[in-house]
Amino acid sequence: MKNLCSMVEISVEDFNRAKEFYESILEIEITEMNVLDTQIGMFPMEEYLNLGCISKCDQHIPSKNGTLIYLNADNNIAGMLKKVISAGGEILTPKTKLGDQFGFVAVFLDTEGNRIALHAQK
């Protein structure tokens, strides 16, 4: 198996606020759609294995206490953390080294109350 994760779905309460937040920090354009009464915002897809979205659904509740996903910071964690603050997020863990082999991570709280991590090799 090449990649263990095939899709990431981030639950949101305020779809427009979350869309603006993630478009700002990731510098992407989110495509909106509705599927089975769920408002979905798809991240751009270059490869099938890099699929992600935000979703607003009554059954999904944003949380900082559950699974932690790591977004690719493209070797610019410091720059992305600045964007997180500008877009209304909160830094929970600043850029931290994961030993000599695994790069760096940081953790933030998004505008919806989700705990999200960033990862980069440098």
What are these regions (language model features)?
Residues 16-17, 38, 49, 75-79:
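Short alpha-helical
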Residues 25, 49, 90-93:
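Residue-level signal for pocket-adjacent positions within structured domains
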Residues 29-64, 115-120:
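Conserved short beta-strand elements that form part of the metal-binding/catalytic scaffold
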Residues 1-19, 47-49, 67-69, 122:
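N-terminal beta-strand motif that seeds the catalytic metal site of vicinal oxygen chelate
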Residues 7, 11-43:
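N-terminal first-folded block
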Residues 3, 5-13, 31-35, 42, 59-85, 104-109, ...:
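Vicinal oxygen chelate
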